[in-house]
Amino acid sequence: MASENKYSFNKLQKRIRRDAGKAIQDFGMIEDGDHIMVCLSGGKDSYTLLDTLLYLQKVAPVRFSLVAVNLDQKQPGFPEHVLPAYLNKLGVDYKIVEEDTYSIVKEKIPEGKTTCSLCSRLRRGILYRTAKELKATKIALGHHRDDMIETLFLNMFHGGKLKSMPPKLASDNGEHVVIRPLAYAREKDIEQYSAAMEFPIIPCNLCGSQENLQRKQIKQMLNGWDKQFPGRIESLFTAMQNVVPSHLADSALFDFKAVTADGVADENGDKAFDTDSFTTNFETEDSPVFASNIPIKHLA
């Protein structure tokens, strides 16, 4: 590897590891003694997640164990040997769960329709069961910053909700804690890292399902913004960490009926008849001015 390329790779690797470490710390994702089940699909995100957690396991101030789990859903053409060979080479504890969800999905969903929703529900149930069998205290998923932003817009545009993908949550069955250590990582960084590491990627469309058109459109919109307006994606993600319930319209989050004029001036209060002015110019992390334009609490 040439000197310049090696420097670029080291910088990329350090950024991903730093982002993951910060997310883990900010959201209290990993505790001493945790046994973490890392869901490994064979895609760039889950490979990067496992690689990053293996590194952090060596340097973290707390002790935790890892077990990689892959769900073989018996999709046609699934390369069964790829993940075992990779994990054996790494010396990582792992479990391959074989469940023929492919046949169930094909039976229930008409030809040509998107199967992702049913497939996801089936997969989730199997992974929850597996986590219980392995006595895992946390389930780690490989979703990243861009997934979270895409989900925010999907819910706003198509679900009428201001809701994204949380970095940490209790599972819907109430039995598990799910964490997303790559919550701060950029997809473009993960793509570059995955290519540089030459992970043995397994295609995600072996089932033949049509791509989720709504998510595809959101991704195209965000990619367009990222190119046309550098820093907009960074600003969007920072906004997700600076929610002001009193300035939205959800009465379940803020008691608007209780708002009264108390006669006390507040120099930091909002001016009802003035429009907000914005002076912060968010740039991408590749920009030399990035660090000076992001609130300190969002830096490493």
Swiss-Prot record:
Pathway: tRNA modification
Ranges spanned by the short sequence motif PP-loop motif, renumbered to the chain: 41-46
Annotated catalysed reactions: cytidine(32) in tRNA + S-sulfanyl-L-cysteinyl-[cysteine desulfurase] + AH2 + ATP = 2-thiocytidine(32) in tRNA + L-cysteinyl-[cysteine desulfurase] + A + AMP + diphosphate + H(+)
InterPro entries: Rossmann-like_a/b/a_fold, TilS/TtcA_N, tRNA_Cyd_32_2_STrfase, tRNA_thiolation_TtcA_Ctu1
Source domain of life: Bacteria
Miscellaneous field: The thiolation reaction likely consists of two steps: a first activation step by ATP to form an adenylated intermediate of the target base of tRNA, and a second nucleophilic substitution step of the sulfur (S) atom supplied by the hydrosulfide attached to the Fe-S cluster.
Name of the protein: tRNA-cytidine(32) 2-sulfurtransferase
Organism of this sequence: Idiomarina loihiensis (strain ATCC BAA-735 / DSM 15497 / L2-TR)
UniProt lineage: Bacteria, Pseudomonadati, Pseudomonadota, Gammaproteobacteria, Alteromonadales
Gene: ttcA
